[in-house]
Amino acid sequence: MRRRLIALSLLALLLLLAGGATTSSAKSKPKPKKAKKALTAKQKLAKVKHFVVIYEENHSFDNLYGGWEGVDGRTKAPAGRTTQVSQAGTPYTCLLQNDGNLTSPPLGASCTDTTTGASFSSAFTNAPFSIDQYIPATATTCPDPAHAFSFPNGVKNGSGLPGGCTRDLVHEFYQEQYQLNGGAQNRYVTGSDSIGMTMGYYDTKALPIYGYLHAKGHPRYAILDNFFQAAFGGSFLNHQWLIAAASPTYANPPDALRSIIDSNGMPVKYPLYNPTGTVRRGPIAVACPSPVPGRACGDFAVNTMQPTYQPFGSFGAKLVPQTNPTIGDRLIAKNVNWSWFAGGWSNAAGVVSGPGWTNGSGPNCSDANVISGSKYPNCPDNLFQFHHQPFNYYAAYAPGETKRAHLRDEAEFLDVASASSGKHCGLPPVSFVKPLGEENEHPGYASEPNGSNHLVTLVRTIERSACAKDTMVIVAYDEFGGQWDHVSPPGQGATAGPHDEWGPGSRIAALVISPSLGAPFVVDHTQHDTTSILATLEHRYNVAPLGTRDAAVRDLSSVFLAKAAH
């Protein structure tokens, strides 16, 4: 009995010790950490402290980024939105060319077209073609800046500067609507002064920006393949929509400034287009009622005009000062600092000794690249584009006004970003960056690869600074530059989405760079237009929308939901 009690006691002791060891072991184990809850897209947007909008020039998505992996690019274009048709609706056999480096001769003709009434020979069939194959980056086809607008059909290879420039292409309000053809995307050739050039595209993978974003250690980025220019037409109007989501007004303009369109909505004759009636290519919309249903009419500026205030150019009529609200006004009211940084601004605006100033102390402009006839201190570069400075059209930003201080030189942006080290980013919360003409990628007067190199410089400067940790960089092209794209914009044909009589127009190239993206490289297929940039700023800083379009579109926080490309 005694032995049995001793055995039971020992067993109890062993169980107690085992239990104690188990308890002690359990206590020594660290408690598992709670999984960190993923931030929503809205929360990620709220954590962005700096926005940098780099506004490049004149390229449709297919023309520039159509060869990027994972996107709705050129290889996915259906024949019905690729094959170009004549004014009568007949598919061309060949592409007629008038860029001096694409005509036959000098190129050998391998195609004959008899669809236009007068036959022509060409080296190009009716299909998209590689520009690089005929005008590589090394081609000496770029104009001297002093004569940049003297070569309507481009500079012959061997007689210009290196850079692989092409001729310019028309990109205007009424013409683009004809080119889109209700979403058929098949009248880019017929509705253009540059005809077959509209179907050219660049080797996406040869672009400097592509190389930078595929190099080891590249920043996280999104490519947006469903992003459209806000308004039909050109740079002037789309810069206005970038800052105001509205078309400029001009009450009771001189009649000579009004556009006149024919029954097809076209205002001009081109090599493959013959007007059906009286036409006039003007900066102001047609008089109401519009002769073509759905075409905008009234007292609105739709094509390039000059600002009233310096700096302004000598070509074209001046637009009366604008007074409607802009995103700049909205941000100022919320005490959010911002700046428009433009290449060449100090020289053009007469900011003597300011960042980027290169014209000495007077009494004459001394920079060799100044526009001939300029009077000191307004010494604009030959390729300074006055209509790319949208705030300068507004009375609130006139010389002498307090808000004028928000208009600065791109050189200052680079200086401030470069000097941002440690934990401090010296950039304002919102920066718009507009490169000078030589560096903005615009066909005709700028080299695409050189402009893309400058874009890399801008992005790299940000990414190497203290700003990189909380900055969203938005790279967008202002408009299509007259170049074909296969995706129908909202409001064209059966394509749904926010639209009105002003746009959106063709799909354009766009990128977003942010450390908060879900993967090193994502593709965002969400539908956007240029006013999505405004919506992003409006939502981030809780300011009222400027118009109906920016109130309706998706903002760019959608990039935080985008998936990695496969």
Q: PLM features: residue spans?
A:
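Bacterial N-terminal signal peptides that target proteins for export
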Residues: M1-S9
